[in-house]
Amino acid sequence: MKKSLATLLLCIALPASAEVSTEVLCFRTDGDKPVRFELRTYYDDVAKWSGGVVRYAQSKTAIPLLFKHEEQEELAEGRPYQFTTTWWEMVDGKINGEYEMMSQGAMVYSMTYTNARTGKKTAFGRALDVDASAKSGCRW
């Protein structure tokens, strides 16, 4: 009986130990003094959970992101879907701003930050020339 229970518990626990996937993307504004940040997103396929953080260059702390929603659109049959993903930036338990990213396949077409208090929008471009990894983040 004890062996059967242990086997059953092990079978239940194995799917729950699935790996969380991590993606690191680097962004910056245009201009002489660009604003740069690293976006880390996390996804757990078993729990169907998604979240993330942003860390601005020169900052030691990451700002948590709360997944708001994702829209998908098929632009052409047989091509990757276009996704528009929105996250809320959370500071002291309140929504401080909103990040919206439009992507298709591996291409990121736009990234916009909107300040919740002022409504000011800031457009960012993907920094493809910056090396990034899940272990070290963006190497500015």
Report residues per predicted region.
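N-terminal signal peptide c-region/cleavage motif recognized by signal peptidases
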Residues: 13-17
